[in-house]
A protein has these predicted regions:
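Conserved Nudix-box catalytic region and its N-terminal flanking loop in Nudix hydrolases
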Residues: 2, 45-89, 137
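Acidic, metal-coordinating catalytic segment for phosphate/diphosphate chemistry
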Residues: 9-48, 52-53
Length: 187
């Protein structure tokens, strides 16, 4: 996990819908002080959802302000929710599915001037239990299933939205650890 960029002494100077702005005094190397600023984004969840048939769920999405993109299921953690609650909710809303097992894989933080935690979950042996709520005023979603190898290729395309996850996959490709990742997903 990347070190958080906002110290505990920081003061919240603005609270937005997605972002809060923080300021704090920082002593410089010459002893002078300066005001620093960073933003904290509400956390998100990303779900690597699998079926009993060893397929991975992907989404083709369209949103009015973004256009078309691909992604794994997931969403924003509302201020009153936990990441686990959001994971279950998003899997049900976007895919109409419930997981037999949910496991937290990792939490990443973008670091720098934007403090943004992303919680990655493995949702194993997902089962369809209802019709997805995937065509709303704010997003149009089409769900599809891929093999592990197809999934890896899909995450490396420019239209894959989650760039932090894309980097994680690229790192596994470079370090030749995709087999370990596959075992984590399905076992």
């Amino acid at each position: 996990m990347t070190k958080k960029s906002i110290p505990k002494s920081a003061k919240k100077v603005f609270e937005g819908i997605l972002f809060d702005v923080y300021h704090w005094e920082q002593e410089m190397f010459d002893g002078t002080k300066r005001t620093f600023e960073a933003v904290k984004r509400i956390p998100t969840t990303q779900i690597i959802a699998t079926t009993k048939e060893k397929k991975i769920i992907m989404l083709k999405e369209q949103q009015p302000h973004i256009g078309n993109f691909t992604s794994v299921p997931g969403g924003q953690v509302e201020r009153t929710e936990t990441p686990l609650h959001t994971t279950k909710k998003e899997l049900l809303e976007e895919c109409g599915m419930k997981a037999e097992t949910l496991k937290l894989w990792k939490i990443t933080n973008s670091g720098g001037k934007i403090d943004w935690e992303s919680h990655y979950y493995f949702a194993q042996n997902c089962k369809q239990i209802k019709t997805p709520e995937n065509n709303t005023a704010g997003e149009q979603i089409k769900m599809y299933e891929l093999t592990f190898d197809e999934f890896i290729l899909e995450t490396q395309k420019p239209e894959f939205r989650n760039k932090m996850f894309q980097l994680e996959i690229y790192k596994m490709i470079k370090e030749n650890t995709l087999k370990d990742f596959k075992n984590l997903i399905f076992n």
